[in-house]
Amino acid sequence: MAKYISQVNVSLDKADEQQFANQGFTKINVDLNKGIGGKCVYIWFKHGSVAITKLQVTFNDEMAVGLINAGYTKIDKNLNAGADGDFIYLWYFRGSGEYNTPIEAIDVTTDADGEALKFKNGWERLACDLNRGAAGSWIHAWVKREKKTYICDVTATVSYETDSDHYKKGFIRLDEDTNRGAGGYFVFIWYRQTPDSQRALSELNVSTNDREYQSLEQQKYTPVCANLNEGTGGNRVNLWYKKDHVKHPVTAITLLIGAANIKAYKVTGVPVIEKNLNTGNGGSIENVCFYQWQA
């Protein structure tokens, strides 16, 4: 029996739903427009022998260029159809090699409590709210891979120029701007996964001022050079990592927006780095969250 997610699609109306059902797709019964009206939008999937290995989301045209150049396929149906939010599109890729572990399950959540439990249980969260800009429920897609993977590299970009290179090297973009609501550049965190736990990162951290920067340097963390606050006039903000003594390897990373979401993750014991990526500007409260495998 085929175990991989091999096809993904999106329905915007009853005709789409009937077509996908007839083709053997399975519907994820969560309306992606929940809480805002608009069309009833659903994600569908199908199992097969040729695996999808990457899913990404775009909320502007510039985000799409690197995906196109790297060979990703766009599902050309707006996940915010009929609502007033951003134009949100889902993209997928079928790859091979160390950085392309097959996806075997896909799901959707509508609240932070459900998210936190999934995050602890080996699911990988797509960072972009599928209701982005529409003020409805917090909707996130999730994937689970056929075997455990570990975060082995992190980086960040302050322009779209190197996107295709990052995708071709196996990186996954956290599809939410670390400058959300603050103006400035579109800044994104990227990560790369491997099944090899010995190559994993062991710690992540964030600095939001000179004192924190110096402290993390003294603790032998390595900085990601890009300023996550680039162009906003706020504090310089950097992501940091360690890659030694991998007793509890990092298996997942995501971005959380808003105090309520942060609280839900903390209650379930998921580490949240309590340093706002928008420190010093008027943007959204954003925090990096990660999980370490407890063997």
Locate each region found by the language model:
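Terminus-proximal functional modules
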Residues: M1-A295
